[in-house]
From Swiss-Prot:
Lineage summary: Bacteria, Bacillati, Bacillota, Bacilli, Lactobacillales
Keyword line: Hydrolase
Acylphosphatase-like domain: residues covered: 4-92
Protein known as: Acylphosphatase
Keyword set includes RNA-binding: no
EC top class, as a word: hydrolase
PANTHER family documented for this protein: ACYLPHOSPHATASE
Source domain of life: Bacteria
Active site, per annotation: R19, N37
Family to which this protein belongs: Belongs to the acylphosphatase family.
GO MF terms, alphabetically ordered: acylphosphatase activity
EC number, UniProt record: 3.6.1.7
Length: 92
């Protein structure tokens, strides 16, 4: 079953390649959506994919896909009305 979530990721997640390594993980797993830096120093991810694959992706995000980053907290919000994406993009 397809699922969509918003992940708000807090910690050392800007200026360490977090968005680009998140994209690599998403591309490898076939997850679509976006990742962007936020003014408060966090990163926002909108991710869509099959339930089991999305859980793998969320686990990789929580573990920090970049060795120079650090994830302190992830706030996960289920999304209902999301436009379908055909790829995973780094924005902002």
């Amino acid at each position: 079953m397809q699922k969509a979530v918003q992940l708000d990721v807090f910690g050392r997640v800007q200026g360490v390649g977090f968005r680009w390594t998140t994209k690599l993980v998403a591309d490898r797993l076939g997850i679509t959506g976006t990742v962007s830096n936020q003014p408060d120093g966090s990163v926002k991810i909108i991710a869509m994919g099959p339930d089991a694959i999305l859980e793998q992706f969320i686990g990789a995000v929580k573990a920090s896909p970049t060795p120079s980053g650090r994830v302190d907290r992830v706030v996960q919000t289920p999304l209902q009305d999301v436009s379908a994406c055909h790829k995973f993009s780094v924005v902002g």
